[in-house]
């Protein structure tokens, strides 16, 4: 039920995102003689996003300074990932470890054949084997559900809207006989803001799905709930610096790796941790002890 609802919500959010783009395009068509520079920038935005999608594993791993580990170096990680991959009838991903003490994990790659799973030193020290299994189930489901593609398409559309909005502010001075200048300025400013909010909402919806699907894969929702509770406390103690490379990769992680704040919550790529834990408790039919 939750998964069906989240799928409809994701589709609806994509619909709103495209509606914002079409409204912006219609306004440009009514108010400018030529929109060529705008659409050139839009294509650049799409191309950049496609590059990011195709190389998502390399970009995220590089941003976290992660290194690939062998089974001899990380036997527990290999054992858990091999078991869950076999259970899902999917190929074994590459396994990486990041030296940061921020307790986090992520999976990336454009498909299961090109997937990579990364755990930080912080999360490996913080969680027990059962909790780590819950986290890895969540991360693997992001790959199996093609969430990298979903987030890339959302980023592409949001990027187009932002590029068009910026170009409209600078180059929107053509023939305005059929346009309302105030409406054009308002749309140029508000459309990127709205697109970012929608993009973040899509990301939060996919997190809920990965929680649910990952718990079904492991058969242990409370293991993930316990892990999330520990991770929330650990991230507060050891937040990552808001470096732009880390910000760009943060939507892949199981928890927001930065220190919280009012604006961070508004643009959060992850749902509130208490809501995620409550959903997992309902799946298990009992509260987390």
Curated annotation (Swiss-Prot):
Does Transmembrane helix count among this protein's keywords?
Answer: yes
Q: Which residues cross the membrane?
A: 11-31, 36-54, 153-173, 182-202
The UniProt entry, under HAMAP family, shows: Pept_M48_protease_HtpX
Name the EC number(s): 3.4.24.-
GO biological process, any: proteolysis
Q: Which residues form the active site?
A: 139
The domain of life is Bacteria
NCBIfam families the UniProt entry points to = PRK03072.1
Ligand binding (Zn(2+)): 138, 142, 207
Q: Care to name a GO molecular-function term for this sequence?
A: zinc ion binding
The record's comment on protein family reads: Belongs to the peptidase M48B family.
Q: Give the cofactor note text.
A: Binds 1 zinc ion per subunit.
Check the record and name the InterPro entries matching this protein: HtpX_protease (IPR050083), Pept_M48_protease_HtpX (IPR022919), Peptidase_M48 (IPR001915)
User: Record's Gene Ontology CC terms?
Assistant: plasma membrane
List the subcellular locations: Cell membrane
Q: Name one Pfam family in it.
A: Peptidase_M48
Give the chief site where it resides: membrane
The cofactor required is: Zn(2+)
Q: Which CDD domains match?
A: M48B_HtpX_like
Q: What is this protein called?
A: Protease HtpX homolog
Sorted keywords for this record are: Cell membrane, Hydrolase, Membrane, Metal-binding, Metalloprotease, Protease, Transmembrane, Transmembrane helix, Zinc
Membrane topology listed for this record: Multi-pass membrane protein
